[in-house]
Amino acid sequence: MNRLLWTPKQDSIQNSRMTDFQNFVEKTIGKKFKNYSELHSWSVHDLNQFWGTLWDYAPVIHSQKYEEVFRSGARFRDAKFFPGAKLNFAENLLRKKDESLALFYRGESGAEAQLTYSELYKRVGALAAYLISEGVGPGDRVAGLMPNVPDTVLGMLATTSIGAIWTSCSPDFGAKGVLDRFGQIRPKILISTDRYEFKGKSLPLSGIVTEIAAQLPDLKKILIGEYPSIESKSLEKRMESFPKNSIPLEESYKPFWGKEPSFFQTTFDHPVYIMYSSGTTGLPKCMVQGSGVFLNHWKELALHSDLREGDGIFYYTTCGWMMWNWLVSSLSIGATVHLFDGNPFHPSPEVLFKYAADRKIKIFGVGAKYILTLEKDKYKPSSDLSSIGAVLSTGSPLPGYGFEYVYDSWGKGLRLSSISGGTDLNGCFALGNPNLPVHASELQSLGLGMAVEIFDDSGKPIHEQKGELVCTKPFPSMPLEFWNDSDGKKYEGAYFDTFPNIWRHGDFAEILSNGGMVVYGRSDATLNPGGVRIGTADLYSLLETISEIGDSVVIGQEWKDDVRVVLFLKMSPESNLTPELEARIRKDIKEKVSPRHVPAKIVQVADIPYTRNMKKVEIAVKKTVQGEPVTNKDALINPEALEYYKNLPQLSVD
């Protein structure tokens, strides 16, 4: 059993939204549950009752009732949720129209902006009317090349309110990275800003907008918002450098001021979002998702995160990561969504903590990499974090010492919930739970309605053992389809090639006896020396504690009819990989992780490659080492780092 770090108080359990939902289930359908395990078991064994009860509890705003909750199909992906229902995604997010705060923004420079629910509602109505005037309708695509500012939320809500499809990329993707995505889905409207800021620099966007617009044949108009700034405003002057079919965003909808959102009524499986895979193995896959995303987000935010109307919620994310979509769904609960754009360590590591303290944020979300960076520096926030009830961590596994750092340095009274899922489902398979204790390294519980199991290589369920994370039953937020995949081969190949009709997610994980989960890394990055599969998370966890090591990546190199473990190290400033240090690293790995994890080779490199969402790319490193092409380096934030892994003489000998 991993170390116990937090236990919920009895009164907080009684008052949690999870308990309230459980009481609602007992009252409406007569089911009684002794614990969360029983509640979860019911939720996955009776999909009709669970999702139907959640629909009523939320409740989902709709104009036409569904014919049935769940209709199974011949294949996993053929299943339908809520056929016959009519609703609108944006209408379910814009439930409130009052003067309470919907959005609060702060940039790294200190610039701030805010919108009440009333103001947001009015702007959505006006922008939606403009989009309709430009011929945008149901099924058309509106793309955002956007920083994380209020106008991005406005663009998404206006788009989905008329039945069109929203898709977005972060400006740091670069022209090729953006075209690899938007070029496939061919938007009618592009929304961007005049510039954005990062690490104290003002970065204009006219160049990249001009370059990508020239290669989007269906593009009719480009709307340019003004990036929030503490400087004097100068959008009019900056507009001169954008393409001729560009107009200021605010000017586009001014003539339509006073128009209310029409909220075009769609089926439950009408497309809402197009999301993208990382694209590290080729062109990004374009995953089309519907209103099931909203219902799943609502469940995760309200029940698993205990978010309530009026609460402040924050997640450090860009608009190119699914956590942006997840965060913005908090509007459906009536919370205040806190946005931040810029570098989270500029001008100091205190910037996000000060934001949380100033705004009395209740739910504070970051990537595991952020926590581990601060842990390595033994950073102790000086801001008052007493308002934070829950810290959420995702993006990669958070090791036990990362948990302990948060409790030692941020506060002992908060609930630290590691959450794990993916862009594919726009949500989580395992995540937090206000009614359960927190143990180091563990995700507290499996998600309600998610039939998650662990399979061995032969496709048999295993318990308290490491294996493949799978989902055995459909869920509402699964992709409706992949764009440009008429025969469904890309979709089938992405999830169902390994185990027929079973969703294989690609994580190497273990479900524990207490119902929690530990994720050991991506299953395609697991090491396989001597035919025994071992995860990478435990190894990374140890290496993070060695002060001489700045960063690391480990791969399994195919060698002499077997696989050998190769460890690459980026050293801390003023440190080098000496024979003595190498011997100590091997000894520590053998004693503290396992003898199987001990590398055959340890190689010092100048840099470690990452995706733009700060995930290590073991597969790209492995391909480079083995002389195989890496097809889409633009998916990486530092593609030049792969050069350090080519033709290494140490890896051509025993």
Task: Locate the predicted segments by residue.
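Conserved AMP-binding/adenylate-forming
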Residues: 303, 357, 389-391, 397-516, ...
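AMP-binding/adenylate-forming catalytic core of the ANL superfamily
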Residues: 144, 169-195, 209, 345, ...
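Conserved AMP-binding/adenylation subdomain of ANL enzymes
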Residues: 292-312, 321-362, 377
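Structural core segment of the AMP-binding/adenylate-forming
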Residues: 161-251, 360, 367-368
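Conserved pre-ATP/AMP-binding loop-to-beta segment of ANL
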Residues: 99-101, 224, 241-276, 283, ...
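Adenylate-forming
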Residues: 147, 189-208, 229, 318, ...
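Conserved AMP-binding/adenylate-forming core of the ANL superfamily
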Residues: 37-42, 103-157, 174-179, 245-252, ...
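AMP-binding/adenylate-forming catalytic domain of the ANL superfamily
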Residues: 221-224, 591-616, 629-653
